[in-house]
Amino acid sequence: MSSERRRPLLKLIARVTALVLALVICAVLFDLFYPRKTSLREFDSDEVARLETAMWRSYYEKQRVRLFNEATELLRTQYHLTPVKSNVVAYYAANAAFVFKEGKQRSDYEKALPDLIKFYNYLHNLSDIDFDVYKVSKLELEWWIIHRERENHAPGDLARALAELQAAIYNVPVERVMEHGRLRAEAMTIRDTKAEQGGVTEADWAKINDLLRRSWSSLAQAVKN
């Protein structure tokens, strides 16, 4: 084909490509900025438990990409975020987790707070629940720190911190969500104890998943309108 004949075809290809790119950009912008609300009360506790178990494994195995993908799936399927928003929000969650993981003391851990604030600010703006973003972000970080420094805390401190986080998000009395906190803390304790003893087996992960399933089921019942 001569250059004269190719020129119109190349122009057509360029125009089609530009149109496709424009449509993709419009779709992304619509996804990001079109106002919509989602319910944080409507989730499948079994699926949340399955994904949280997977995320814990990815975190401790230092699998950043896998953790990001699991967080995206959780936000998209259980908290009803759109594909683009779920990726943006998951980035902040995963980044906060690994910033915290590298920390050695409270001043290091607090470097994760800006990403946690961005994470919860997105959820606040998308959810049908009005909560204090800064307070919730601080409570999230606080249970991370209590868990990391658990040898310096009483046995019930972690369960209480986990319950206080959900109480602040859902605007319910902390006593109503203590069972959630207790079961989730128990799952964490099993993971920590088994890791210190040489390794977490598949049977251990199954037990952890069961505790998390019961924990999230308890929360789902506690926060229903």
Question: Language model features by range: what are they?
Answer:
Residues 51-54, 89-93, 186:
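TPR repeat positional signature
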